[in-house]
Amino acid sequence: MRPRQGVRKPGKRNTKSKKPDKASKGKEMVEAEKAQKMQREQGEELEQEGQEEEVEEEEKEEEAKEEQGAQEEQEGQGAQGVQGWDDREGQPQESQNLFPESLNEEDIWKAIGPSEGFDEDSPEFRPRLISVVSPSLSTMSPPSKVSSPSWGEEEPLPLPHREGSPPASSSGSSHKSYPKIFQTFKKDLSEVTVDRDMYPSLYERVQMSVQTEDESWLQRISAKKQIKRIPSIEITETLPQTQASMLRENWVINPEEPKLSILCEMEFNEDFVNLFETSLRTLPSVGPPAILSFRKEYSYMDVNFKDEQELEPTCEFCGSDLRSLFFKMDTSSENIQTKPKSYRCCCLQFQNLLDYINEEMLTIKPPALELISISPHAAYGSDIDRLKAKEKALQKKQERQMARHFAIISHDQSPTTTDDGKTFVTDALEIQKTYSQNSITQREAGNILKYSFPCSAFPSWLNFTCEQSVCTDLIHTEMRCSVYFGFDASVDGTILLTYPSGNLAIIRLPNKTDGFICIIQEDTPTNPTILALFDSSGRSSCYHPNGNVWVYINILGGQYSDQAGNRIRTWNWSSTMPSSSFVSFKPVFLALNRYIGIRILEQDKVSINFLAMGQQATISLGTKVMLHDPEEVPALWFLSGDDLLLLANLIKIRRLFNKLEGCMNFPISQAWEKLKQPPYLSSLSLKLLALCHNSGIQQKTMETIIDLIKEEE
């Protein structure tokens, strides 16, 4: 609190004060300076709370105490210090120093309170006060414990007092005799080193040199309008020293400090950088993002930029100006002429340089494009010549393909004759070379042709060893093909078709009896498999990729089987047996591979379709065959003896399975021996016997079937 300003109260001057020695004056100055620092610190802390009502009440109490102290001073009593009271032991502390007695009451009031005719520069009223703080000190305890630094405590300096006066901690009567500026202080800040830049509030605002010169700084402080609350000093209980408290003393943190970087100035700077600095930087901030923050651009005022200046072209040899020469000269590389223009140069050396440059540019110049005429012109040669050239080229191509194919066959196949389909192609080619005839387009009805096929020319599994007497009513061959795949047709009726890979696909050859035979094989260079076989006698066969018969045709009809060999369809030709009770024939379409397809519409409407590279070739192989005596043809010709034997074996197998089931049901007793076959097996046996009598099979085969289906007794 600031001292009460006004008219100084009259009183007697104490002229009997003793002169203190120099040692006591020095201690008092140091203690006063320490007290000033401590009080400023406490004032800063309590100023934040902003309790104005308590400040006014405290102000009134302090003024009353000051008035009472001023009255006691007038009685001529000596300066007395405040006795310290130890809270832990409850004993008053011993006094150490005394206030100097060189200043009486009147001199103090002259120095503190302004009056008429007061001259602050007068040396008469300039007391020797060092580091005096605001006189509004109080002994009241602070309302709460704030986070203030832990300072080293010292015993207060007790001053002499009158007999019978109580201690300062228990009563405030000892403070009524003297102004608060002369009271002793509890804290000592001399042992604490605090940075002045970090904590400006802990240091005095008035410099030491100003305080020692005059008392004008006291007047400026007292003239402030805002009254600051400074609590009284209270002696706190000293806690036992521990390692944690000792570490806490080194951390001097001001809670009002807005910047968190104050931790860097402390003893544990390295620990702060490693543990806290990175996390503190990531704290969220208020405001625009950092990318939008203002960044001061660096100034380049010290750099002097010169304007670009165009140099005048000058000759390197003689130094003359070349602007007029370059204005007339065409330096573009696109307009280079064979004979460049001659320019008047300034000197001979420059002229030689230009000539050399022109020669080099002519050397590296690309040749000019030669344009051809695109106007219409007459064709080269006649149409006949162009057609002959195409036929000749096609013939050479086919010869090369056939030569390559025969070379592969002769290399892979042995010359010995075997009964398989591999030697059949070679034998057929030999027949083509030996026998030749004119192409047959039509023959008169009634002519009997006997087709005899030797065993060496066909595989044994084809079963073409018997002779057939048939009458050829019409033999007609139709051929349509393109030139984009291998095709060759000679005068004797030989036809060759090759796959796009060059392998032989279809070959059609004439035979000895004015007929033909056609073979279709797969697309492989070595050991090709036969896919289909057709002849003019009316017998044809097509095969699955696994070798089983797919479609079989004879002069009476045909049958259709699956890959497992199971018969799916059977039919007879309508021309051979019109009165038959069997269903009429339905067309059959087969795809032997990706290039060849078979179409069977009627006996005389059988064709092969070859499709490759977008072109198609069709070969008609249908033959109309008529029998002389149709009544001699046995009924149900489509059922052979082998088929009937298979049915008999099937009935026998089912009967054995039935007995095996009985053994499993009655394993101990022999009742299964007395069990008869199921009724459905007996019915199948009767039907098979009737079928055998109607089919006209041989007697030997009939006896074998009866033995198979006969139930053992």
Swiss-Prot record:
Extent of Basic residues compositional bias: 1-17
Domain of life: Eukaryota
Location (main, coarse): nucleus
Keyword Metal-binding assigned: no
Biased composition (Basic and acidic residues): 18-43
Low complexity compositional bias, start-end: 165-174
GO CC field: nucleus
Region (Disordered) location: 1-177
Database matches in Pfam families: FAM194 (PF14977)
Biased amino acid composition, Acidic residues: 44-61
Record field: compositional bias (Polar residues): 133-150
Alphabetized InterPro entries for the sequence: FAM194_C
Keyword line: Nucleus
Location in or out of the cell: Nucleus
TM region positions: none
Similarity comment: family membership: Belongs to the ERICH6 family.
Protein name: Glutamate-rich protein 6
